[in-house]
A protein has these predicted regions:
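Extreme N-terminal tail/first-helix region
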Residues: 2-29, 146
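Hydrophobic/aromatic-rich, well-ordered segments within soluble, folded domains that form packed cores
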Residues: 37-70
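Residue-level detector of well-ordered alpha-helical segments, enriched
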Residues: 43-50, 87, 111-118, 130, ...
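Chitinase-like catalytic core of GlcNAc-active glycosidases
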Residues: 62, 67-86
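Charged phosphate-binding loop/patch that engages nucleotide di/tri-phosphates or the phosphate backbone
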Residues: 127-156
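Mid-chain, well-packed structural core segment of small domains
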Residues: 77-123
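A long, hydrophobic alpha-helical segment
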Residues: 27-39
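Short helix-capping/linker segments at secondary-structure and domain boundaries
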Residues: 57-63, 123-133
Length: 156
């Protein structure tokens, strides 16, 4: 898998201006890899930012900035997008099949926190959807406090 490295600030700006298309572009080769890894019950490669996106500001890397969901509208667009919404639900369903493991066993500690943030964000956008099931199954129903604060502050 190739990871795009930003060589100039203009590169990052260009990708940010692409809207949710930036996720589709990133997933072109890596979605199948990510799904296969989750189906096997263990994340092994680097794709978390654009497969399970979270609210911008949670991470400090260029990838967490680039693939961070900027506001509620972008989160809604992501879920409503025919490709992205379908893929997020598909890989989330695959994750739920591993209810005999912890999120940390599947993702590792840091990425397990990112998934919790992602599920909290999308559960707030689409209550009653599959995302609450992940939070209940892997996180004892506990939501990401930072994400909830951002939503309450209307920054998402």
């Amino acid at each position: 898998m190739k990871i795009k490295l930003f060589t100039r600030k203009s590169d990052e700006l260009y990708y940010r201006q692409q809207g949710i298309e930036r996720f589709i572009d990133a997933q072109k080769t890596d979605y199948k890899i990510a799904l296969a890894e989750i189906e096997r019950g263990r994340k092994q490669s680097h794709w978390i930012w654009y497969i399970f996106p979270q609210f911008v500001g949670l991470g400090r890397s260029c990838y967490s900035t680039l693939y961070g969901i900027r506001d509620r509208q972008e989160a809604e667009e992501y879920l409503q997008n025919e490709v992205l919404g379908c893929r997020l639900r598909e890989i989330t369903n695959a994750l739920l099949k591993h209810n005999d493991k912890t999120a940390e066993e599947i993702f590792g500690g840091l990425d397990a926190m990112k998934v919790r943030s992602c599920m909290t964000l999308f559960d707030s956008i689409s209550p009653g959807d599959i995302f609450a099931q992940v939070l209940d199954t892997f996180y004892d129903g506990k939501r990401c406090e930072f994400t909830l604060s951002a939503i309450a502050d209307k920054t998402v």
